[in-house]
């Protein structure tokens, strides 16, 4: 028994650590696998073309515009092959030797050291005299993009590029730095990592002053500049090499051509590969409406910029791009056939289609009221496959089919700030999200979340389409529909910790976003340094829950990302509330500044409108005064004319006219005597004459004429009637009345009135 206890004590002493000895350290747990690492677990050997490399790019402060465009160009297979093969392809042995110096593997325990440092910092902050006691500290969200980027920098291989232009036989330029970048990724023995494009940025800032500042830059402008710089550098180097090409033997030259053709480039020294990939030809057709002659003018393009309309699509935008435009008024067309300015119709059509079509959606528009650029959040739908219809009749391959392979997304409220990310379709692994240092797989439907109508500030800005065939499209669709259950399982496994395509998680995040005091500040705060799409797309995917019926809901478990996001707020309410108040105060300040600016512009417009109305009122008043003055002048002139006519009427009634009347009476007396000779047998006393008017009653013209005519027929001869002289005068007046009845001037207004009045007056005078 004693020996048994001694052996047990001896064994216990051997196993128990001594007092002065240090305990053995446990192996540190490996860092958790990222969704990208899980996706690449079943991949085979590394390829030599670099199509299976998925490297992020470090952001040096507002360089996301450069990272997103470089990623899109790298995953364009023909462009990557052309860059690597010009002027010659660097041997893989040389690349491996160079990468041995530039590729650096970080400490695998760096994440543990970072966590320990964070704990020490937290303890130091708690021991400060000014720190409030027992204040809960907000734990770091391990599913946030910022944390993932930080961990990627600490755990992934870091690849730095150096100037290898002498090995290419070229001088250092933007093209050689781009070639260094692509060759470093292709020659790396690791599938994942982070590239440091510091050398590329140094060359870019050295040659172009506009990129030397840390200001927010435009990704489309950088794309256009980069393509033009590559063309210029390649053509400049080609001019230096004709003597070298002529010195090469014909056999060696043909051998180099065949080798380059097998590696993906047409010739090692060709300078047209950028034009063949990105360049297209636009034809401007102008038809004169006078002579109907059509004139054409061709121009090349490296990308197409299209205007946007609300609730439209890329197809409708292209249709508007090629719509007929009327050239009239001040914008008339000078027709050479007519020899002058004429009205015309103008339209733009595509004559030669590029192999890679870069579509720039013009999201930024200058507004007159704000006097600055403003972002348009219009809904513009872009398809996975596109066929252009606005081509000329003689276009080369007008039925070319394109497939979408990359989307550059702008996240932000305006053109002067924000963030760029790229969503790219890889050759074998589907769609990936490239957000600076972070690379994560996403679902195919995730690409549809940036039409511009979803909540948030993320919108598609540049679309990259590459040529494809109908057979390839059908083969891809068959592959997608071949085994939906297997595809669903793989998607759930690879995206379990990503949170992009999980409908239940999106519902949780979407419900949390309804709280304005927490979600809105976090969403706006993500734009400060490097806002990414993982938090924003969760809002977008919520509306696309029904768009993926192939994923069964029971097989999808709630992912990890939304859990810390929903529970992190109540863990540290004071700190989060303080941060929220600061952000809300900043947002309120910006909003008030914008409101003041809008109010100032509104007052300015109102003042301009008021001045315009006053000027218009003064002009109307002057016009009315002029019209009134003209009316008064016309009235005075008419009054003078009326007075002159009255005076002439008075002259007609003066004694001078009576003489004229007597002469007329004399002529009438002759006719009266002539009538008396015919009516000798007719004798009627004057007292019985019914035609004598009553002096007390005003006679009418017709009455006077009728009565006097009867009297004229019944009047006895002048030698038997004592008042023959009076009757003679009276019959002379009757002759005047008959002449007046025959005169057409009697129907004129005013003329007959005065004559009837004079006849009545004279008749009464004779009777009296």
Curated annotation (Swiss-Prot):
Entry keyword Hydrolase: yes
Domain USP, first and last residues per copy: 55-468
Coiled coil: 574-633
Pro residues composition bias: residue spans: 551-564
Gene3D superfamilies reported in the protein's UniProt record: Cysteine proteinases
Bias-annotated ranges (Basic residues): 663-675, 751-768
Biased composition (Low complexity): 713-722
Alphabetical keyword list: Coiled coil, Hydrolase, Protease, Thiol protease, Ubl conjugation pathway
InterPro entries, per the entry: Papain-like_cys_pep_sf, Peptidase_C19, Peptidase_C19_UCH, USP_CS, USP_dom
Gene Ontology MF term list: cysteine-type deubiquitinase activity
Pfam family name, one: UCH
Example of a GO cellular component annotation carried by this entry: cytosol
GO biological process, one term: protein deubiquitination
Function: Ubiquitin thioesterase component of the regulatory network controlling carbon source utilization through ubiquitination and deubiquitination involving creA, creB, creC, creD and acrB. Deubiquitinates the creA catabolic repressor and the quinate permease qutD. Also plays a role in response to carbon starvation and the control of extracellular proteases activity.
Subunit structure: Interacts with creA, creC and qutD.
Record protein name field: Probable ubiquitin carboxyl-terminal hydrolase creB
Naturally occurring in which organism (per UniProt): Aspergillus terreus (strain NIH 2624 / FGSC A1156)
Gene this protein is translated from: creB
